[in-house]
Amino acid sequence: MTDQKLVTVIDYGMGNLRSVAKAAEHAADSNTRICISDKAEDIRSADAIIFPGQGAAKACMKALNETNITHALIQAATEKPFLGICMGLQVLMTHSQENEGVDCLDILKGDVQKFDLSGHPELKMPHMGWNQIHQTIDHPLWHNIEQNSRFYFVHSYFVSPHDKQIIAGETTHGKRFTSAIAQNNLFAIQAHPEKSADAGLQLFKNFLNWNGQ
């Protein structure tokens, strides 16, 4: 009998966890168990990690620090298949401009910047709704997802990684911005795959089948 695969969805009070967990469960096979947890031991024992998030960077970092899971989270982000979603992408960076400046997890070197929509009166903030992701690299998490597929976004800030080689996807809202990154065992996306219909479901399937390489 094959050992069951455990995927932990990290609960730190800042994500639509149920929607993410339900989408992952829908994508999972019978040998995969999805659990929601705020415990460091469940992060360490998991075979893969999903790190969702929504809200403001300062509140997210405060919540992470209060749950005492930061060390386990950083360790997992370098060791096992790891999927960051929305704010779960942004707080992986070094620093965010949000809330007058917030130090983030510094797992990935880079900054989080606010959209500048000057010259684009037709565009709104936040960037909300469906938009295309242009895949900039060939990656297992893009498997069976068509180029320029539409995903659902809700955000006012975007990541700017120092190493442009880790950019996995780009989207245009006034300007072209990084909407997905990939580095070793880690993949993170600005959009909400749990709200992104078939493309989002396929992304979850790809992640659950991914060995992190």
Swiss-Prot record:
Catalytic residues (UniProt): 86 (nucleophile), 192, 194
Alphabetical list of Gene3D superfamilies matching this protein: 3.40.50.880
Residue intervals of the Glutamine amidotransferase type-1 domain: 6-213
Gene Ontology cellular-component annotations: cytoplasm
Known catalytic reactions: 5-[(5-phospho-1-deoxy-D-ribulos-1-ylimino)methylamino]-1-(5-phospho-beta-D-ribosyl)imidazole-4-carboxamide + L-glutamine = D-erythro-1-(imidazol-4-yl)glycerol 3-phosphate + 5-amino-1-(5-phospho-beta-D-ribosyl)imidazole-4-carboxamide + L-glutamate + H(+); L-glutamine + H2O = L-glutamate + NH4(+)
Keyword Cytoplasm: yes
GO biological process: L-histidine biosynthetic process
Classification via SUPFAM superfamilies: Class I glutamine amidotransferase-like
InterPro entries linked: Class_I_gatase-like (IPR029062), GATASE (IPR017926), Imidazole-glycPsynth_HisH (IPR010139)
E.C. number: 4.3.2.10, 3.5.1.2
Main location: cytoplasm
Pathway(s) where this gene product acts: Amino-acid biosynthesis; L-histidine biosynthesis; L-histidine from 5-phospho-alpha-D-ribose 1-diphosphate: step 5/9
GO function terms (MF aspect): glutaminase activity; imidazoleglycerol-phosphate synthase activity; lyase activity
Entries under Pfam families matching the protein: GATase (PF00117)
Top-level taxonomic group: Bacteria
Location of this chain's protein in the cell: Cytoplasm
Keywords for the protein's UniProt record, in alphabetical order: Amino-acid biosynthesis, Cytoplasm, Glutamine amidotransferase, Histidine biosynthesis, Hydrolase, Lyase
Reported function: IGPS catalyzes the conversion of PRFAR and glutamine to IGP, AICAR and glutamate. The HisH subunit catalyzes the hydrolysis of glutamine to glutamate and ammonia as part of the synthesis of IGP and AICAR. The resulting ammonia molecule is channeled to the active site of HisF.
Subunit structure: Heterodimer of HisH and HisF.
Descriptive protein name: Imidazole glycerol phosphate synthase subunit HisH
Organism (species): Hydrogenovibrio crunogenus (strain DSM 25203 / XCL-2)
